[in-house]
Curated annotation (Swiss-Prot):
Residues 143-372 form the Sigma-54 factor interaction domain. The keyword Ribosomal protein does not apply. Residues 434-453 bind DNA. Keywords: Activator, Arginine metabolism, ATP-binding, DNA-binding, Nucleotide-binding, Phosphoprotein, Transcription, Transcription regulation, Two-component regulatory system. GO terms for cellular component: protein-DNA complex. This is Transcriptional activator RocR. It comes from Bacillus subtilis (strain 168). The keyword rRNA processing does not apply. Positive regulator of arginine catabolism. Controls the transcription of the two operons rocABC and rocDEF and probably acts by binding to the corresponding upstream activating sequences. Induction: Not induced by arginine, repressed by RocR itself. InterPro entries: AAA+_ATPase (IPR003593), Homeodomain-like_sf (IPR009057), HTH_Fis (IPR002197), P-loop_NTPase (IPR027417), PAS (IPR000014), PAS-like_dom_sf (IPR035965), Sigma_54_int (IPR002078), Sigma_54_int_dom_ATP-bd_1 (IPR025662). The modification 4-aspartylphosphate is found at residue 57. Pfam families: HTH_8, PAS_9, Sigma54_activat.
Amino acid sequence: MVKDSEFLTLVFQSILDEIDVGLHVVDEHGNTIVYNNKMMQIEDMEKHDVLNKNLMDVFMFSKQQDSTLVQALQEGKTIKNVKQSYFNNKGQEITTINHTYPIVQDGKIRGAVEIAKDVTKLERLIRENMNKKGSTTYTFDSILGTSPAIQDVIENAKRATRTSSSVLLAGETGTGKELFAQSIHNGSDRSGGPFISQNCAALPDSLVESILFGTKKGAFTGAVDQPGLFEQAHGGTLLLDEINSLNLSLQAKLLRALQERKIRRIGSTKDTPIDVRIIATMNEDPIDAIAGERMRKDLYYRLSVVTLIIPPLRERKEDILLLASEFIQKNNHLFQMNVEHISDDVKQFFLSYDWPGNIRELEHMIEGAMNFMTDEQTITASHLPYQYRMKIKPADIPEPETPRHQPAADLKEKMESFEKYVIENVLRKHGHNISKAAQELGISRQSLQYRLKKFSHSSNE
C-alpha cells in the first residue's frame, strides 16, 4: 500500500511538471506547497526559493489584494481569467492571466490553487512597440555602396516610395533589409506617420494575434483596450520582419486583414478600418519558402507587389572596403580612437572572404578588431577576432631560398626554416613584443618562447 501511494505521488508530480500551465498551491497560511516546472519558467524562479515559503515573502505585489491566491484564501471565492502583475525576488516584472480556486475541507478554507498563463512577453512587446512608434533613423543616403548590384536595388526602392503598395524585401541575414525599409518609409508620403517594426520570429504563436490586432477590454478579466500593430501603424508603415517564420494559419489571418483593410481586436465584434503600408522581409528565396510550405502562395502574391532582392556582400566586393572604412570611422567616434588604415593582408582577406553574415558580420569584425587596439592606426591580422585571424595568410613572405648547389633539405628542415622565418618577421613587426607576436601568430606566449629557445639552441649547435 505504501508503495502504491509513493507511485501515485510520483505520477502526480510528473503530471504537474509536464503540463503547459503554471501551477502554484499554497496552504491556509499562504505557504507554498506545490510549485510546478512551468511556474518556475514563468516566474524565473527555482523551486527551493519558493517551496515552503510564504507567498508574500517571495513575491512583491503593489498591495496584498493584488495576489489572487491571497484573495482566494481570504474570500473563499473562485477567481477566473484575471490579469495579475507582480515582481519576483530579482525585481523582474511578471504578468499572468490566472484562474484561482480556494481549497475547502469541512467548510474551512485549507489553501488555494492558482493556474497561470504567462503574458509577460506580450505586455513587454506591446510596450516596446509603443516606444518605437515613429522611430526611424535611416534614409537612402545611409545605404553605402557604388557597386551596380546595390545601386540597382536603391533605384528601384526609390521608385517604390511614390506609392503605398506592399513591398517584399528578400535577402540573407545582415544584408540591410530594415535599412531599406526605413528608407522607403522616410522617402514616401507616409514619412510623417508612424513606422512600426516587428520581428515575427520573436513572437510565440499564442501571442501573434494579440500583438498584430490588439485586445478589447473584457476579452479576459484585467484586459484593457490595447491597440495592435496595425492600429499603431495607422497612417504609416508596418514592417513585418521574417514573415516566413509565422505559421500558415496565422499567415491566412494576416492575408485577410490585408485584403479587407480592416482588423478586429481579440474579444471585439467590431471591425476597425486600417490605412497601413506593409513592408515584409524574408531571409530566404520566396519561391523556396513557398515550396517548403513556410509561406502561403496567396500571401506572397499579396505582399510582392514590389519585390526587392538585396544582394549579399560577396556579390558586391567593390563595396567591402568602403563599408569597412565607414565602420572604422563610426567606431573611432565611439571609442575615441584614430584608426586610419587596414593592412594589405587584411584587405586581401576581406575581398576573398565569403561573408555569410554579410554587412553585419563586417561591422562586428571591425568593432572587434578595434577593441584589441590601443594607439595603433592600422588594423592588422593580429587585431582580428581569433576565428578570422587563423584564415589570413601572411602577406609578402618569400619562400626561403635553397642554393642550387646544395641538396634540398628534407621536409622537416624546410618546415622549421619557414617557421623560424615567419616568427622572426612577426617579432620584428611588433618590436620583439612577445605578447603581440604570439597573438598575431595565434599561439600562446609559452609556445612562442619555447620555439625561440629551440631556434637559439639549433643555431648554437
